[in-house]
Amino acid sequence: ARIAVRAALTGHVIFSTLHAPSAVEAVIRLTDMGVAPYLAADALAGVVSQRLVRCRRSDGSYQGRFCLCEVVPAGRRLRDAIRRCAGVRDLTDAARSDGAVLLPDVIARTLAAGRTDEREIRRVCEGGSSW
């Protein structure tokens, strides 16, 4: 993680994956892996979290899949929150202020549109803990 952050700080575009319950919690995961908060704040351009869920059919069965995407740009407020080692709630508020599209909002729109059901969301989204 530290090598990737150093590369990002020198102008390289870095795409990476890591396991975290949400895009905001991925930022905390970086610091858990030894990246200094001020470096993470400077290196990040944004974080995307995705979940692949099954499409609900009208008969209650499933066919096909689609992606729930959470997109968190690293705006000024989020970077400031990262630098001060803010917790999940403050990071989430900062991300939302910077225009993030967060998973709970994506889930609400998806359920309202009838694209899948709550059972499938709970199955895929870690038992509903991330929303």
Positions of the model-derived regions?
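Short, flexible helix-loop junctions that flank or precede catalytic/ligand sites
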Residues: A1-W131
